[in-house]
Amino acid sequence: MSIVQFLKDDLSTARANGCEAKIFFTHHPLFLERADEGDGYFVIPRVRRKVILDILHEHDVSSVFAGHWHRNNHAEDGKLQMVVTGAVGYPLGDDPSGLRVVKVRGDGVTHKYYAMDDLPDSIAL
């Protein structure tokens, strides 16, 4: 089974089961600024990106979370958020090493980046 078919099947199952919050995690970001931006080392190639984005939009996926760029970044394509999280060990931008906590609740998806030096003792989930 291809990744594309897996994604279609999984999101169809989520829809059939009444899943309200749908998110997608991937190593490489789909895009950094715009869904129609050019190809590059840090993003999924456009020809593959379009196929994936069409599926995600068709199934009302709200957020895509990725890494690979070693910087924090946020962009949108319609209602879809593209959230890139910086590295824990070797950040390339101005953001310090850290991690992102993603919370999925009935009313939606929230996320927050924590620098390693600023991690709280506990995080309410």
Task: Give the role of each language-model region.
Residues 72-125:
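Binuclear metal-dependent phosphoesterase catalytic core
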Residues 1-82:
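His/acidic metal-ligating clusters that form di-metal
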